[in-house]
Amino acid sequence: MAFQGTSRTLTQQSSAATSDDLQKILFSPEAIKKMATECDLGRHHWMRADNAISVRPLVPEVTHGRIASFFKSGYDVGELCSKGYMSVPQVLCAVTRTVSTDAEGSLRIYLADLGDKELSPIDGQCVSLHNHDLPALVSFQPTYDCPMETVGNRKRCFAVVIERHGYIGYTGTTASVCSNWQARFSSKNNNYTHIAAGKTLVLPFNRLAEQTKPSAVARLLKSQLNNIESSQYLLTNAKINQNARSESEELNVESPPAAIGSSSASRSEAFRPQVVNGL
């Protein structure tokens, strides 16, 4: 027999008041602060020797409990069709190194389910990055929605796991990982197409790329040196100041405009001071 019921969204299944309650749970100042401090959403997480394994849930524990209670209360009175699911379409991690390229070490990053005691990668979605491969972008796509339940003493949800290997002699931060995602919550769930974890190696940022002429740095340094030399002539005698001012006036006399294409015009353009990005 074919199913003849109606499919309703979360907002349709609950009243406006309960929908507002859910919004307050997700976007209250406390919830936003917890997402930053407990989950490192949009923040840089430093991988150090004393933090070789990092497990970051995608939902704070307090927020998880409140969301689960919201769905359970609606489910118990028949307003919602389930006790709630967490859906994460994609997790994107930007990874950069904070040591030189010759440092021997690597990172292992994957997405796990806190309901799994072994914290195994979900559907084998795991990426290994050697230090000299960085920077890189890593992406994960869960193939199912996670039930909002408690397993033992663990609040079940997705988590980003980062393992640091090697880096002998480097006790400080060797890499920085910035993760971003958007968690969604619904009373309905689904399964999704399996997609392998994505790894995109990124070229290091070239701070001088916007300068087309190779002598831009030399011109900048020369202009700075000229400014330093001129600042050394601090004269206190009024008569000498007058002479210095007259010399300055002679130097500032405008010369006739050079013809376009002449060697003097090209030299004038070549020695115009420029600001180099990053210096």
From Swiss-Prot:
Residues that span the membrane, as ranges: none
Where in this protein does the record put region Disordered? 246-279
Say which domain of life the source belongs to.
Viruses
List locations, semicolon-separated: Host cell junction, Host plasmodesma
Regions of biased composition (Low complexity) lie at 254-268
One GO cellular component assignment for this chain's record is: host cell plasmodesma
Q: Which InterPro entries match?
A: MPV
Q: Does the keyword Chloroplast apply?
A: no
Q: What is its main location?
A: host cell
Q: Which UniProt keywords apply?
A: Host cell junction, Transport, Viral movement protein
BP-aspect Gene Ontology terms: transport of virus in host, cell to cell
Q: Which Pfam families match?
A: 3A
* Record family assignment: Belongs to the cucumovirus movement protein family.
Functionally, this protein is described as follows:
Transports viral genome to neighboring plant cells directly through plasmosdesmata, without any budding. The movement protein allows efficient cell to cell propagation, by bypassing the host cell wall barrier. Acts by forming a tubular structure at the host plasmodesmata, enlarging it enough to allow free passage of virion capsids.
What is the name attached to this protein's record? Movement protein
Species lineage, top-down?
A: Viruses, Riboviria, Orthornavirae, Kitrinoviricota, Alsuviricetes
